Amino acid sequence: MRVLYIHAERFTWDVKDPASDIRDEPISGKANNALVIFATVERGDIPDEGFLRQIARDIIDVANKVKASSIVIYPYAHLSSELARPYVAREVLNKLYEVVKSEFHGEVYKAPFGYYKAFEIKCFGHPLSELSRSFKPEGAKVEKKVEERRDVYIVLTPSGEEYNPADFNYDKFEDLKALVDKEVFKKELSGGSEPRYLDYLRKFGFEWESMSDVGHMRYAPEATIMIELVEDYAYMVAKSLGIPVFKIRGTNMFKLSETAIESHARLFGERLYVVESDTDLILRYAACFQQFAMVKDWVISYKHLPFGVIEIADSYRHEQPGETVLLFRLRRFFMPDLHIFTRDMAEAIDISFKLHEVIFREIEKLGRTYVSLYNVTEEFYKEYKNYLIELAKREGKPILVRILPGQKYYWVLNVEFHIIDELGRPREIATFQIDIGNAKRFGIKYVDENNQVRYPVIIHTAILGSVERYLYVVFDTMAKAEKAGKIPRLPTWLSPVQVRIIPITRDNLKYAVEIADKLETEGIRVDIDDRDETLSKKIRDAEVSWIPYICVVGSKEETEGVLSVRERGGGQYKTTPEELIKKIKEETRGYPNRPLYMPRFLSQRPSRG
């Protein structure tokens, strides 16, 4: 922050036109015998207590030396070319004003932020009447309050016993130990080598986009099919909760000048993705903004509750460049974000039991399970400890609980569901939160049975996790299988190509096309390897591509009306097209379907570099 101090005999300011979407109330004012602080908030300045107290002490010290009876903090954007974002600058100046006001024995004023203003000043002209200063956040020391309390971690068992994580016996709970080591003891669990799943991603076209920002991906046709199938499946799973669900779409940019957006965004901190524009915009980091902005305009009765709203939100988080991980930690990703609006805490808790069941059901379909971290406020833990014990019972194992003193966030409960990956690292996938703050923040209301206006309790959840993280689990599961000596095989519903037909000669191509037509009519993704390659190479390429069903057809198969099938991980056999269709339909029942996003014939596809 750069500041110019002027000790003024008289200072007046008159508010004119708005200069920013982010602004205070337009209040004009005047002060006599005032130390006027022309303050420019710079990039990197933060509303940190230690930083602001450092500045406040200097201001008050100068004010006392010149015997000023008042102080005026005047937002002034002309002392630096490296300006902070308006929403940051306003917050810094507002908090600086509060600190100075609490410590100075005189009048303290602040001219409004975000306006063009006319001012008149009469400087005393003595040696200390004009001074300049520059302050940097890194030079400030945060003063710890004696009464400040730290988070507390406990291991809570299904029988209700509480343990200090350092004293718990983890012999039968290796996954919990990995989570505790990371969350409680802050041990770096790097895994020691490059994860195997990265090799698989190249096979299916999940790649970094080098011509974009760090942490942005691109998706080849095979990857695109998989991404969109998971998006479809997330909606199906949301509807399985047994409550009405509305699917919406919206924008990914929101104005920081909106009070609700700014206050919610402030909780997210430095990972905000800010867009350079004529107004301050942020890219959303989940679907919350759009869903809440829409639902606030709905007329809701208690009879409508509970209901859910879901959007597959393209979400943005400004992760550090060295922290981005392909398909896991990204700056841009797709989040199937479901918000469930409930009457009160009792109804939210009741619905959360079904939600918890579905979250575990879906991970178990992939052959995995979760180890759970329950972040709770101290008040919630005291009142609802038995609720957490019941969830631990349903998981059938101890859970890690982090108890936070005070109400720091909009939620009272934030559950993180982790897998332990191939390299032994906890990886957060699914989540749900119970939110008591955002309905009021965004003005979302309903009318109860007594005609009283109330704010709903909102559940936030990503049942599958983000689309990319769900696929991360799929590929990590394949890595574990291969590590155990098994042949990795994608779920049939997720396989970009479910059947590949390989004609032995050009004479068999017509029969291959007839079979492909029949399979495609039944909603099966099928392609034909019509390249001028040897049969062994075609089979090998199909196996490298993890095609679940490779069907070789020659004159004998054509005469008999059958297929010679090589099933991935399932041996070789002959079957009719009808039996193969029946088998695949059985494997994909209950899952979404998408067509092939590539030409049917391999000869028409360019190879990827």
Curated annotation (Swiss-Prot):
Organism per entry: Pyrobaculum islandicum (strain DSM 4184 / JCM 9189 / GEO3)
Main location: cytoplasm
Region (Catalytic): 195-491, 196-491
Co-factor: note: Binds 1 zinc ion per subunit.
EC identifiers of the protein: 6.1.1.3
Requisite cofactors: Zn(2+)
UniProt protein name: Threonine--tRNA ligase
GO cellular component, one term: cytoplasm
UniProt subcellular location: Cytoplasm
Known role: Catalyzes the attachment of threonine to tRNA(Thr) in a two-step reaction: L-threonine is first activated by ATP to form Thr-AMP and then transferred to the acceptor end of tRNA(Thr). Also edits incorrectly charged L-seryl-tRNA(Thr).
Keywords: Aminoacyl-tRNA synthetase, ATP-binding, Cytoplasm, Ligase, Metal-binding, Nucleotide-binding, Protein biosynthesis, RNA-binding, tRNA-binding, Zinc
EC primary class: ligase
Start and end residues of each stretch annotated as Editing domain: 1-143
GO BP, sorted A to Z: threonyl-tRNA aminoacylation
Top-rank lineage group of the source organism: Archaea
InterPro entries xrefs: aa-tRNA-synt_IIb (IPR002314), aa-tRNA-synth_II (IPR006195), aa-tRNA-synth_II/BPL/LPL (IPR045864), Anticodon-bd (IPR004154), Anticodon-bd_dom_sf (IPR036621), DTD-like_sf (IPR023509), Thr-tRNA-ligase_IIa (IPR002320), Threonyl-tRNA_syn_edit_dom_arc (IPR015011)
GO MF terms, alphabetically ordered: ATP binding; threonine-tRNA ligase activity; tRNA binding; zinc ion binding
Gene3D superfamilies assigned: Anticodon-binding domain, Bira Bifunctional Protein, Domain 2, D-tyrosyl-tRNA(Tyr) deacylase
NCBIfam families tied to this protein: PRK03991.1
